[in-house]
Amino acid sequence: MSVVNFYGQLSNTQQFDQIRINIASPDQVRSWSFGEVTKPETINYRTFKPEKDGLFCARIFGPVKDYECLCGKYKRMKNRGITCEKCGVEVTVSRVRRERMGHIELAAPVAHIWFLKSLPSRISTLLDMTMRDVEKILYFENYVVVDPGLSILQKGELLTEEELQKAKDKYGEDAFTASIGAEVIQQMLKELDFSKLKQELYEELQTTSSEVKKKKLVKRLKLVENFLESENKPEWMIMDVLPVIPPEIRPLVMLDGGRFATSDLNELYRRVINRNNRLKKLIESKAPDIIVRNEKRMLQEAVDALFDNGRRGRAAKNANKRPFKSLSDMLKGKQGRFRQNLLGKRVDYSGRSVIVVGPELKLHQCGLPKKMALELFKPFIYSKLELYGIATTIKAAKRMVEAEKSEVWDVLEEVIREHPVLLNRAPTLHRLGIQAFEPLLIEGKAIQLHPLVCAAFNADFDGDQMAVHIPLSIEAQLEARVFMMSTNNILSPANGRPIIVPDKDIVLGLYYLTLAFDNEVGAGMMFSDLAEMEHALYNKFITIHTKIKYRRNQLNAEGKMVPVIIDTTYGRLMVGELLPSNPNIEFKFINKQLTKKDISLVIDLVYRHCGQKATVIFADQLMKLGFKYACSSGISFGMDDMVVPESKSTHINKTQLEIKEFEQQYSNGLITYGEKYNKVVDAWSRCTDRVANDMMKEIATLPVNDAPNHQKINAIYMMAISGARGSFQQIKQLGGMRGLMTKSNGQIIQTPIISNFKEGLTEFECFNSANGMRKGQIDTALKTASSGYLTRKLVDVAQDCIITEKDCGTDKGIEVKSVIEGGEVIVPLAEKILGRTAAIDIFHPVTNDLILNKGELINEAKLEQIESAGLDRIMIKSVLTCESTTGICSICYGRDLATGTLVSEGEAIGVIAAQSIGEPGTQLTMRTFHIGGAATKGAEVSSVDASYDAKVKIISRNVVINSEERKIVMSRNCELLLLDNHGNEKARHKIPYGARLLVDDGDMVIKTQKLAEWDPYTIPIITEKSGKVLFKDMVEGISIRDVTDEATGIPSKVIIESKQYSRGAELRPRIQLLDAKGEVITLSNGLEARYYLPVGAVLSVEDGVQISVGDIIARIPKESTTTKDITGGLPRVAELVEARRPKDHAVIAEIDGRVEFGKDYKSKRRIIIHPIDETMSIEYMVPKGKHVVVNEGDFVKKGDLLIDGNPVLQDILKVMGVEVLANYIVNEVQAVYRLQGVKIDDKHIEVIIRQMLQKVEVTDSGGTTLLAGEKIDRHEFDEINEKAIKNGLKPAEAQLILQGITKASLQTRSFISAASFQETTRVLTEAAIAGKVDKLRGLKENVIVGRLVPAGTGYFMDKMRKAAVKLDEENV
């Protein structure tokens, strides 16, 4: 027996390794068929038997009943294989009616609509005609000249009926041949000589210079090559014979009441057969041409409707005016074959019920209702009953179970013992949505769930339901126990932190337990053992909050027990008792008021140092303790717990005065409406925060009147500070003031809600508040769908990303450093490199000791060494630089976050990455409505303060001193660094153009000193010389307009769009500075002093006035602020991973050089960059209205922005390369999630980026068969080049391209995966023509063909099977 047969025994299906798709030839269709369907009848309405030669004919498709012919002459198994001589039916199983096909011989050829109408149309591309023309021929509107003969007509020219008649009169009947219908298209396709055509196209491609023509030729050439390679014949796109799918797949069902329900396909087939039969008769009876032609057209339309109803013309509809579901519709969309039946299946052995909390369960257990268990485990019970001789037969066992005899329950107990069940809660957004538990039988009808796993399932007990599934085979049980047991899923795969963390009331209980109060009874007493303390507590000598001293034995580094005396409380010691003994887990970690964060850290520590088992036990005991004290603490929620601060009115009055001042400035015309809006919103924002802070201070310390020595602690404050429930956001609204509200479009309403919920809202406030609330509700409804869609796209693009080897051996890596924003370290380096591997050997900068070897995993211990060495950037390996040809290697990926060890082979990291990014998206969209539309907006940054005592260093310092002796920054890329004594960078701040510098290069500053300040709401345009103002190209009403403010009546001059006027097309509004002689002043960089003004700029000077250095001549208002929340964020993530061009995108400088403004072209401004080495300068055309962030004469670096906005990802890739691009995408995506406090590991985003960078675009074909402009898989390209180099040819050249995830999914190597994703018909059409082969490497295609996925255990089965095949080959 060969080795591979052993694997074949696992299933009785045929073993195959790849699937190929082709166009079926007419002969192939006939070979599949078991007979021709010639009649449109289905079944006889009296006998209910299928009609002979009809759509359900038993002779063609097989018997209706097992082993029984139609007339009943042959019955039973003994006659198997006999064909009845009376009715012609073969005696066999009725199952063959699911697999036997028939066919219809068409009386006239018919075009296949997929090849005609699926864009780009394959038939028209091959014939080099337009699709419209081909349709005219096919649908009998025009004739086409096949052979011009003696006439001057062109081959392929279209003629109408009249033109044909005229041509016949002119040249004679037989001078030329013109024809019509699918026959002629078929003939034209047959006549194509592909080898010759390929040669001609190649030559034409070399000679043509027109880009449009090149594109067209490349398309046609690609198609010709596809046909040559796949050995498909082009005439097969026109069908002579039509396959009929098996009848069981298009069933006819009898309903009660004698009516029939039928599949739409039967109706569509009937139309085809009717028209085909009619056409046969017409041709036989030599009917007039016009009638035959009409019938042929009808036949073509009937076949079109069968294949893809509604693709062309009006869809065929049924009696209820609903379009019929055609064959294409059977495959397409969520309800199609792919997504409904192949990727998602209903599961037997499953049940569902409501969940309730089970606090006395252990972490690996769940409570399963007895009734449910009995039903689910039936087969196991039957076999056991029979085995023990309790029941004699299965039938008897069945009766016993139905009667619920007492023996049955005993057997059930035994069957269930150590047989894990899977619990699943929909929506399953990440892999922790399905986990395995050991069932405990319980009374009642609800499933009991352990409280600690709720976070992973995102379950609560307000009526949630969960499904139970039973793993049946031993292998399945084993996998459930090893991989899916809840105790094996302690860490979240998204960020590697514990997900089994106490929550809600457990946290509250532990917080209460670890509180320590001064002035409690027995303060300062000393104890040496716990029993003694318990005694003291019982006799009320101390309370659990009393501060006491205690002698505790602790493990030291050598593993010996040493006694130490600690200051603590009895409550904290109770938690301390639960800690596993380990020198790394010190008592100090819990000797404090425990909040949710602290508890999470302790669990993390326990997991890292003591392993999984200890963690599970610890978490379970912690939960029980938390529940106990949450109950006995008696914490409640009272009206008096909401405290309104005394200072509230003062803050509000102060802010109202500020706003009056802004109104005044606005009335005087000093600021625009937009600026006023921004300032008002900002002032209220600050006021709300101040009130909230005062309230928090008052709540935190609250003396109670009746017992002066007691310090009670506020219940609401406890809930929030411990992290149990509620946020300070919500408390602020209860006791402070509700603050600003958002409108439904995300804009902030200027008047805030001054009241809070305790005082109650006024009518007007209530209305405003409802507006914000409604936004939250609507958001939730709309965004959930788009978030789910994003997850689906991510899974689809990354599904074939699997760990396939240990080490790919690459030397490449990426450099990471901590993320600094506004001078603050937001993400420390440690967080970015934990769990990654080093790309190079890393040495200590001072001692030069080796810290890390190349390829070594950076764990917590190594992290400490790196931090103490003070390294600020590190080269790590990354998925992006991994050189594995299929999949990714373990070393480049690093730590598997769910286990904390190096990732193992076969791990499906692509799916995990997609789930990690998608899951919080869905979560966050659902969380919006909790805060109820209150605006969360950070006040705009308008100054920089020193965060350390340090020395100032200024990069790109370019300042002028204005008339008030202030230093004004003139540089666009000025940066201010703070350095410590060793010259190491501690903070870095970007100083915007126009800011006032308050310190200078080399100054020493102290912490909190102000370094620079600026107006955050406008971008100024500043002069660097004094002179007289001269307005140029400012034509009233065309390029400039006096805008009179409605509120104040004060006019201000604003630059407007001048494109729409013919006179305005050439205008470039600018201000020039003249000297005393009236000549234009020259600036320091040698250019003239002229300042171009963008659309929307507000002038601050009048024509002809004298101004001095550093004066503002115009201001560009920034748009008003809208709230930042994830809804702004999710579309941003989608925009990034879809690689879309952002609206109003930035322009990036491609080289280093000096900026010059060239001559304008129509409505565009010309920006020219001259490089230093005087090579080719680069020109950019930008719309005139856009604000250019560089001035003439500025020096820009490669990658700098010339225009504000989000840069186009493709530009970053082209100019700055892969690493910068990846860094940009990672940071942008992380910024969205960070705003919501969601942590996702960078590597997940990197996996998605790797999938987006799979393809290259050929720039030069060299000696290969590739075409310039062709897009091809990176690895495929490398393979082709290797072959070329072997054969001594010039290799092709190509550049990496970035694809959006949708496009990348549709262009994967696997056509099955692409077809099940989107645009099914197009994908299948393309694949069939090219004769594509699916190697079945991804997860999706394997699920669809019904094999084990090549990931996890399936990966090793696959590997072993391949090894077995190899062994067999060697043995042979």
UniProtKB/Swiss-Prot annotation:
Q: Which cofactor does it need?
A: Mg(2+); Zn(2+)
What Gene3D superfamilies does the entry give?
1.10.132.30, 1.10.150.390, 1.10.1790.20, 1.10.40.90, 2.40.40.20, 2.40.50.100, RNA polymerase II, clamp domain (4.10.860.120), RNA polymerase Rpb1, domain 3 (1.10.274.100)
EC code: 2.7.7.6
Q: State where Zn(2+) 1 binds.
A: 69, 71, 84, 87
Q: Which family does it belong to?
A: Belongs to the RNA polymerase beta' chain family.
Q: What does this protein do?
A: DNA-dependent RNA polymerase catalyzes the transcription of DNA into RNA using the four ribonucleoside triphosphates as substrates.
**The keyword Nucleotidyltransferase appears for this protein:** yes
Record: residues binding Mg(2+): 460, 462, 464
Please report a single Pfam family linked to this protein.
RNA_pol_Rpb1_3
Specify which residues bind Zn(2+) 2 according to the UniProt entry for this protein: 808, 882, 889, 892
In the record, what terms sit under GO molecular function? DNA binding; DNA-directed RNA polymerase activity; magnesium ion binding; zinc ion binding
Catalyzed reaction equations: RNA(n) + a ribonucleoside 5'-triphosphate = RNA(n+1) + diphosphate
Cofactor binding: number and manner? Binds 1 Mg(2+) ion per subunit. Binds 2 Zn(2+) ions per subunit.
Q: How does it assemble?
A: The RNAP catalytic core consists of 2 alpha, 1 beta, 1 beta' and 1 omega subunit. When a sigma factor is associated with the core the holoenzyme is formed, which can initiate transcription.
Q: Which InterPro entries match?
A: DNA-dir_RpoC_beta_prime, DNA-dir_RpoC_beta_prime_bact, RNA_pol_asu, RNA_pol_N, RNA_pol_Rpb1_1, RNA_pol_Rpb1_3, RNA_pol_Rpb1_3_sf, RNA_pol_Rpb1_4
Instruction: Give the protein name, as stated in the record.
Output: DNA-directed RNA polymerase subunit beta'
Q: What SMART domains does its record include?
A: RPOLA_N (SM00663)
What is the originating organism of this protein? Rickettsia rickettsii (strain Sheila Smith)
* Source domain of life: Bacteria
What cellular-component terms does GO give this entry?
DNA-directed RNA polymerase complex
Alphabetically sorted, this entry's keywords are:
DNA-directed RNA polymerase, Magnesium, Metal-binding, Nucleotidyltransferase, Transcription, Transferase, Zinc
Output one GO BP term.
DNA-templated transcription
Q: Is-annotated flag, keyword Magnesium?
A: yes
